[in-house]
Amino acid sequence: MSLKELGDVSYFRLNNEINRPVNGQIPLHKDQEAVKAFFKENVLPNTKQFDSILDKIAYLLEENYLEKEFLDQYSPEFIIKIDQFLKDQNFRFKSFMAAYKFYNQYALKTNDGAYYLESMEDRVLFNALYFAEGDEELALNLANEMIHLRYQPATPSFLNAGRARRGELVSCFLIQVTDDMNSIGRSINSALQLSRIGGGVGISLSNLREAGAPIKGYEGAASGVVPVMKLFEDSFSYSNQLGQRQGAGVVYLDVFHPDIISFLSTKKENADEKVRVKTLSLGITVPDKFYELARKNEDMYLFSPYSVELEYGVPYSYLDITEKYDELVANPRIRKTKIKARDLETEISKLQQESGYPYVINIDTANRSNPVDGKIIMSNLCSEILQVQTPSVINDSQEYLTMGTDVSCNLGSTNIVNLMKSPDFGRSVRTMTRALTYVTDHSHISAVPSIEAGNERAHSIGLGAMGLHSYLAQNLIDYGSKTAVEFTNIYFMLLNYWTLVESNNIARERKATFHNFEKSKYADGSYFDKYVTGDYQPQSDRVKELFEGIFIPSGQDWADLREKVKVDGLYHQNRLAVAPNGSISYINDVSASIHPITQRIEERQEKKIGKIYYPAAGLATETIPFYKSAYDMDMRKVIDVYAAATEHVDQGLSLTLFLRSELPKELYEWKKENKQTTRDLSILRNYAFNKDIKSIYYIRTFTDDGEEVGANQCESCVI
């Protein structure tokens, strides 16, 4: 028997019985029966057996399944020790979905796909040995964090660590295009190369001259951004990771770009096929000035990137539109057109209703809270990566005359449910920071030199979180309540503190900091001021109870850290980012990211299998009232939770808004009828802006027929 000869199995049927209540009760025990049946019928008979871990490793090396170099850093005795430690933890998957996802997507299999070569303990073992790079204490600490599901590396890292025939450890990238053919050509090549390795790519088009702009003095010669969008879409479609999955990309455009209306129109259902983009995602960067003009119901001017760069000597993206707006309007040398700000606001809302796009990056908000030197101009495919970039200059031979910096995303996630049970919260986070540091140190995207240059200078990582709704519900706390907001604030403050501590430790050990550290708010100490003078201790009795036994830094602790950072610096330019979570949240048996669940019993359509049902983690009679669907919540409560986390996160958080096509009037005081309107979305975007939210990801609309609009999650960037 092999995985190719399974025959009739019972575990899918058992799992599907969860969705059939018996006498008003959800038969959750059927999911546990499905897990047992899955191991009995699928895993155990089809796992290749070995006498010992050393025998297994010898086989995996001989058959070219594992890299030899990382294993050579450890003695056989230590490998036996850490393997035994992992076995002693008695790890068990808590749901059928968790076990199925791990063995289907992550476990190493024989070349013919017939047999499993790894268990969860084995995958954790190889991750720990790989990321610890010969440090036995760190390897044991990492194994401890991962087997207890306190830390989860992002999918590309967890999947590929230690494998001989592996993909990259990262799968999320940001590149920018400047206003010349050499940059466009090089960027398309970069998109092809990144898509080939399974990457999701964010691309800024804001610097490109608009349709009708002059080229070499010839008026009306420029084609604008839409044809370039089509080139990128075709590139992602063509370069599809050995035919396994479609490439994925998002293009960003500033709302003051003259092509903004035609840019948005490419996603409309009734768009002409010549301009319609079907698979490319859209995002917009929104300066503060747009919100001001829309609020006042005034005209807004759109400015030609070509004339802006001629006048100011920098690409359009690097100009502060809010600061320079009046100056640009008054300058006769700046080509401009005029539209009504509220008309554009309505167009954005219409498209979000129809497709879930565009993503929204509040670019001035992102830059105001950016503590490092430079300018954030865009984001990634999931809108949580916000890092400074610099433009490149490329000659006719496609060589770099000036090497700019672009971005790769080195991601991992804390599991809130389990990290809150850690015997040492701080040590756990410091260990995770070390694991992510390995990823940034060993990520070399040589096919795109600007990304490699950015990574080498910044050493950026993105530690995030998942399982917030699970944690709150299991502690009988309503998502979005004052208690939930206060908990979120303290939790992310702690992530901020401990990643700073460890980044400072690494900088001291290596005598190295990120590029331009001395120009940052960390170096002059101003970043720490609010923590030194403010009160970030738990206030309510309930939150004090939740954090009982967990160290909460005082103002003096922050002051001490400030002095250490001023002396020795930080290794990482960026440390925190909250991505959406895909498969890894199922393996961890918690709710995805920090947003609410959408269903108590989630229905997933798996390729070649059919429906699998996943009960919310910790679902029980007493927790059911606290597992309220996101579609039945006031989205302002979700925004409030994200705002509490945002204060402490140096990058962004992937914030999805969930709305029904028929909105209950009682949810929103401005509603006079149930139908969702463009005004609803405009009000919520403005609420998010006023709460200092940096980015909004999808708008997911649940329709009367049970379909979701805007729910086509990208595989390349959910971690």
Task: Give residue spans per PLM region.
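Extended catalytic cores of very large enzyme megasubunits
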Residues: 1-719
